[in-house]
Curated annotation (Swiss-Prot):
GO cellular component, one term: cytoplasm
Organism: Bacteroides fragilis (strain YCH46)
Matching Gene3D superfamilies: Copper homeostasis (CutC) domain
Keyword check for Transcription regulation: no
Residues in the signal sequence: none
PANTHER family registered for this protein in UniProt: COPPER HOMEOSTASIS PROTEIN CUTC (PTHR12598), COPPER HOMEOSTASIS PROTEIN CUTC HOMOLOG (PTHR12598:SF0)
Keyword entries, A-Z: Cytoplasm
Annotated protein name in UniProt: PF03932 family protein CutC
Gene name, Swiss-Prot/TrEMBL: cutC
Tree of life domain: Bacteria
InterPro entries for the chain: CutC-like, CutC-like_dom_sf
Length: 251
């Protein structure tokens, strides 16, 4: 019987609680989900650690949205955030850095890896926009990362099945492949069967309406990018359970 592991991408303490109740083995805590995930606040991390009593806590270290080419000041920020995360008792960190030509920024990654000693390290989906997946795989293995979160360099993990399978075969147990992006209760079995990957990353989120009675929908807090202030996406226990059970029930 295969030992599957399920990581839920959470955007709040509320979502962390739902992930744990739904049976997740691990959460990746992020702020700024519309930007692909940014470093959450001190308070959010501290509270997540408090409520996650049976589920491992990994925290994204990403100072901003956009590309993965970081300035010296941003790297210093990431180093300080790693130390903060360590002090708050997280089990792991999630980061990734690229060079101008789409390669792995090995010197910067070495700094971050040194700061992360004793923590589990996931190289995140910066991998999916790197120039050469095979070369990047070897570099990330050499750096000592524990896993790579990837959609197989496609818009979703389901579309990336061919590369995910190839990467798992190339890795040959030297690093864990964590399939993520668009993974849900409808496709997780197919992804597992066709790639042989055993770790999965998904959000299991649903949109919920705001409790606000008074609403001024003429104003957006996001400038020209309009995201409604009167609804938000949260992880739900049901969707976490449904996703996990859709694959475990087939064993």
């Amino acid at each position: 019987m295969k030992n599957y592991l399920f990581e839920v991408c959470t955007n709040s303490v509320e979502s962390c609680i739902a992930a744990q109740e739904g049976g997740a083995n691990r959460v990746e805590l992020c702020a700024g989900i519309p930007e692909g995930g940014t470093t959450p606040s001190y308070g959010e991390i501290a509270m997540a650690r408090e409520v996650l009593t049976t589920t491992r806590l990994h925290v994204i270290i990403r100072p901003r949205g956009g590309d993965f080419l970081y300035s010296p000041v941003e790297v210093k920020t990431m180093l300080k955030d790693i130390e903060m995360v360590r002090q708050l008792g997280a089990d792991g960190v999630v980061f990734g850095c690229l060079t101008t030509n789409g390669g792995i920024d090995v010197p910067v990654m070495k700094q971050l890896m040194e700061a992360s000693k004793g923590l589990s390290v996931t190289f995140h989906r910066a991998f999916d926009v790197c120039r050469d997946a095979s070369e990047a795989l070897e570099q990330i293995i050499d750096l000592g990362c524990d896993r790579i979160l990837t959609s197989g360099q496609q818009a979703t993990a389901e579309l990336g099945i061919p590369l995910l399978k190839e990467l798992r075969e190339r890795a040959n147990g030297r690093i864990t492949l964590l399939a993520g992006c668009g993974v849900n209760e409808k496709n997780i079995c197919r992804i597992a069967k066709e790639t042989g990957i055993q770790e999965f990353h998904f959000s299991a989120r649903e949109s919920i309406k705001s409790g606000m009675e008074y609403k001024n929908e003429a104003v957006s807090m996001g400038g020209t990018v309009h995201i409604s202030e009167y609804e938000r996406n949260v992880t739900t226990v049901k969707r976490v359970k449904d996703t996990i059970e859709s694959i475990t029930s087939s064993l």
